[in-house]
């Protein structure tokens, strides 16, 4: 039974919009300003301001479900293809980034040490993933339970405004004085996808057991 969920790299809680209060959520977020927004939006959740990568290592088997959404910018095929390749001969091209390999560190840690259910979510990368994952709803997933396909509407990330993204993600940031709201909203998992994955975790057994 899924009662306690760790929400790593929680941001403002896009993945948990439709979870309700049937699970106890511990949100781990490094950025104090973002964590304060999360706490205001989801007052019944426990919010921990900490390095999610280290917190996971130290609290690995304290939850029924671990959800991790590590930073995706260094892996993003959109950033690479539209920001770098398409502007290769332009001054406006984005700078190269080392892929943040903490993503794969966490997958390996969870695969070999986690005794409960877990899922890692990220953007579909511009390279062949170093560990094979499953593409569902415009994301790539690694988990120890089956995640079934789900149909979603267009995510609206490329041209979405703050207003349209707030409506799409089910999160209103209008009363918060924080910067880069558009990027924060773009980083949010779609609410119906977050609920779908939680339901898959509840209803599907750990693979191989």
Question: What are the residue ranges of the model-derived segments?
Answer:
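Conserved active-site and SAM-binding loop architecture
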Residues: 1-209
């Amino acid at each position: 039974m899924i009662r306690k969920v760790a929400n790593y790299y929680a941001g403002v809680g896009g993945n948990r919009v439709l979870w309700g209060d049937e699970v106890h959520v511990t949100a781990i977020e490094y950025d104090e300003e973002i964590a304060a927004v999360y706490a205001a939006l989801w007052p019944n959740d426990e919010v921990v301001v900490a390095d999610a990568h280290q917190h996971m290592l130290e609290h690995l088997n304290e939850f029924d479900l671990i959800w991790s959404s590590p930073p995706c910018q260094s892996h993003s095929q959109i950033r690479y293809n539209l920001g770098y390749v398409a502007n290769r001969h332009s001054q406006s091209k984005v700078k190269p980034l080392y892929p943040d390999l903490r993503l794969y560190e966490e997958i390996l840690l969870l695969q070999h040490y986690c005794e409960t259910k877990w899922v890692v979510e990220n953007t579909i990368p511009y390279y062949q993933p170093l560990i094979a994952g499953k593409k569902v709803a415009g994301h790539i997933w690694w988990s120890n339970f089956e995640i079934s396909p789900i149909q979603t509407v267009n995510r609206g990330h490329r041209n979405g405004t703050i207003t349209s993204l707030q409506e799409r993600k089910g999160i209103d940031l209008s009363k918060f004085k924080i910067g880069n709201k558009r990027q924060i909203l773009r980083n949010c998992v779609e609410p119906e996808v977050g609920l779908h994955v939680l339901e898959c975790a509840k209803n599907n057994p750990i693979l191989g057991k």
